[in-house]
Amino acid sequence: FGHPAKDMTLSEAAMIAGIIPAPSAWDPAISPDKAKERWERVLGLMVEDGWVSQADADAAVFPETIDPDSLNRESMQGTNGYLIAHIKQELVNSGAFFEDQITQGGLRITTTIVKERQDEAVAAAQTMNSVNGWDPAHQHVALSSIDPNTGEILAEYGGPDYEQRQQNAVTQDIAMAGSAFKPFALLANARQGGTVNDTYSGASPQTFPGLVEPVTNDGGYSFGNVTLVKATAYSMNTPYVALNRDIGPETTMQAAVDAGIPQETLGLNDQLLNVLGSASPHNIDLATAYATIANGGQRVEPHIVRQVTNSGGSNKLYETTVAPTRVFEAEEVSSIMPALEAVTTGEGTADSVAGALRGFTTAGKTGTSSDQLSAQFVGFVPNMVTAVSMYQSDDDGNSVPLENIGGLDQFHGGDWPVDVWTNYMQNATKSLTEKDFTWIVKSNRNSKNNAPSSVPAPTQEPTQEASNPEPTYEPTRAPEPEPTQTATPGNGGGNGGGGNGGGNGGGGNGGGNGGGGNGGGNGGGGNGGGNGGGGGGGGGANPGAAGGN
């Protein structure tokens, strides 16, 4: 509006309030009719609640806004705009600078971004533009790549053009973790002396105390007794819910928080089905948590700024301090690695990864929304962790399923997200010299058989497996209730059932049985946004279901 917030009129304030749930979708510069519709709604509600009189509301005139194209924003165009906005927000959040100090010049800012890695990330993410059925205006890719030893963000793809969408897919959008949450149960189990060679029943369905509906594996496939290595590779649900019952879901939640999932993450809870990924973290949060594993149990904070000096470089004004915090013992993390490595080899849900990065020890986990609102893969090699998330939104920013993409019947974390991850990592890892994790130590744990003495005979096994049972309490989708709308055009979709070991639903290598849900939250914005983000891509509701591959 061209003036300070304290000088806003009733009309201006009503317009701002109206577009908060989805500012990119309802921006008056992009959708003036929608912005005016929202403005009228706010004024009507203010009259109903007694905040303004009917006469004042009738006299209000829809406000004029400054044409964003008239502003000097060339530097914010394209993919670099997301980096610049992230840098500004990180420095403001540090408390060392005001925004005016950053924008008015006179500072030399050194970032952690490696140009070659950034170019490779952009190229890899934008390979989706050539996929039949992919529409970058509504379908979104988030990619973050970090050094697990320092937390330095090496590359970040937050979207194709910041001027078109001021919502960073990496730091602001959210998506249910789905089966990408399962490694935290492995860590919690390791803390209690468990091992990935512990055995559980893979039978499906299975009933559990406190749940009205039985838990099932993807497509209804039933297995015999399986180790947690196989349960992870195939992303089975029933063994993981049984494991979570034994160790206590509160310990799984705590392991996730210790690894790097923020305590305030939407959907994070201590319920039995949290192991299936009811939490909806940002892409960068998952990358951070997996970096803790890749760093042998030491957590570091992700950051994009290395240091700030005056324009001449002679006076250092700010420097990011790297202070690793040990949250898991190296032996505990070492003990779960066989399960995460199995995901990227053999019949794992990301089995193409190891072959594409020959010579490297690879590990990770896929995740898919049960109704295909999102899909992702978080994988790592020594000294590099990369998370890839994909999701879709409609014109109003609501999450909608990823359908009819590339000729596939279903969209899974083990499909395009793994392809983009591999495309990026094949080039990005050329500069890495370490092929194996140097912190790995021998684990002498005794395995336990936790399976019942009698289980149903296994049905024929699919080539890949995941899963996604639904909780009895969910108003949103597979495992966890979601808010009805998000703050900004966010990545609503979650990771639930489906594909490559996906969710609870039939079809293909996965599928998904999750119910729909309304995601979102009020927040978003800035570095890491807030508890906002919201539904698929362009801004709205419905982050996806959990529990999938």
Regions found by a protein language model. Give the residues of each.
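A penicillin-recognizing enzyme superfamily signal
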Residues: 111-134, 143-145, 156, 162-176, ...
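Second-shell loop/turn segments in exported
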Residues: 1-4, 23-33, 42-43, 47, ...
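Conserved catalytic neighborhood of penicillin-recognizing serine enzymes
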Residues: 3-6, 73-74, 194-252, 299, ...
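Mid-domain, small-residue-enriched loop/turn segments at the edges of structured enzyme/sensor domains
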Residues: 212-216, 248-288
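Active-site rim segments in enzyme catalytic domains, especially the processed small/beta chain
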Residues: 168, 172-211
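Extracytoplasmic/secreted proteins, especially bacterial periplasmic and envelope-associated proteins
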Residues: 3, 11-15, 34-47, 78, ...
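Proline/serine/threonine-rich low-complexity "mucin-like" segments in extracytoplasmic/periplasmic regions
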Residues: 439-549
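Non-catalytic, structured segments within soluble enzyme domains
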Residues: 1-112, 119, 262-263, 272-276, ...
